[in-house]
Amino acid sequence: HELSELGCEGMELLIYGYLPMMVSAQCVQKTTAGCAHQTGFLTMKDRCQKSFQVKNCCEECYNIIYNTAPVVLIDQKREIERLSPAALRLAFTLEDEQRTRQMLALYQEVFLNKAEIGELPFEFTRGHFKRGIK
């Protein structure tokens, strides 16, 4: 709702991607298993047993902790068109080849072929797209 008030003309809108939840200066790799001096991905579980992907950026010694579910707005075409963004972004960070192809195919179906898609077969979030920010 805030997006429609602010306007999205000339802006880019993320319609798919895992968002960073936190950037941490305390190295998860170093704290848990010792520093490997190599950038890569780790998995961290919270108290509810949700798995978070953590990218450790070894050269600068920080971590990016990603949300457990990606933001997916691909099926919100009408609302997106009303906002009139200049560009749409699909941000791939944690995906394997199969998921990347799946999301590109969904984008093509909805935005290029004008098709409707059914329910998505994986966990996702809308972020603040429907709720707004309070």
Label every PLM stretch briefly.
Residues 1-134:
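Active-site pocket-lining/capping segments in soluble small-molecule metabolic enzymes
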